[in-house]
Design a protein with these regions (language model features):
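PLP-dependent class I/II
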Residues: 1-189
């Protein structure tokens, strides 16, 4: 997240083994769990065993899979002791989301899931189209993400080159020119 990489069960098990051996807790951001492509399998970190589950703080929400950004509905699952501490902190740091947002999230999570699958297919088609087009641009490359809806582009081939009278010295320069000349917004990193 947000590179779109999907860890295999074996990779997660290796991470889990280290975490259990050293008593490390993991915050597992599973917000993109329903947006996995190309027959990749999403594996929840907490599903890897009781020891792992005890050390996992799972966070998720409805903003990505259900296109409910702005509704501000997220949730967490953890062992009871951690959940109590988080609930105490939350009760003093923020107010509750609106009632309508809560009911909308319940409906999204418990209702028919067909629309989410249609949205996922559209995201996958857009990803394929974007990656194919990006990799045809000289000086640009990108890896096909296995999940989420971002594409991380490598534009190092443009560094030091002049475009539209401006020398591209950084990712920020490239992003600004891309926005001004191509009307495409990017986030340099």
């Amino acid at each position: 997240n947000p590179t779109g990489m999907v860890y295999t069960k074996a990779e997660l098990e290796a991470i889990a083994e280290v975490c259990c051996r050293h008593n490390i807790y993991v915050i597992a951001d599973e917000i993109y769990c329903n947006l996995v492509y190309d027959n990749n399998e999403f594996v929840s970190f907490a599903s890897l065993g009781e020891d792992v589950k005890e050390r996992t703080i799972l966070v998720n929400g409805v903003s990505k899979s259900y296109a409910m950004t702005g509704w501000r509905i997220g949730y967490s699952a953890s062992n009871p002791a951690l959940a109590k501490v988080m609930a105490n902190y939350l009760s003093h740091s923020t107010s509750a989301p609106s009632t309508i947002s809560q009911h909308a999230a319940i409906t999204a999570l418990t209702g028919p899931q067909e629309d989410m699958q249609v949205m996922k297919q559209a995201f996958e088609q857009r990803r394929d189209h974007l990656v194919e087009r990006m990799n045809k641009i000289e000086g640009v490359s990108c890896i096909k993400p296995e999940g989420a809806f971002y594409v991380m582009m490598n534009m190092k081939g443009f560094l030091g080159k002049t475009m539209y009278g401006k020398v591209i010295e950084s990712a920020e320069d490239f992003a600004q020119l891309f926005l001004e000349k191509g009307l495409v917004a990017t986030v340099p990193c």
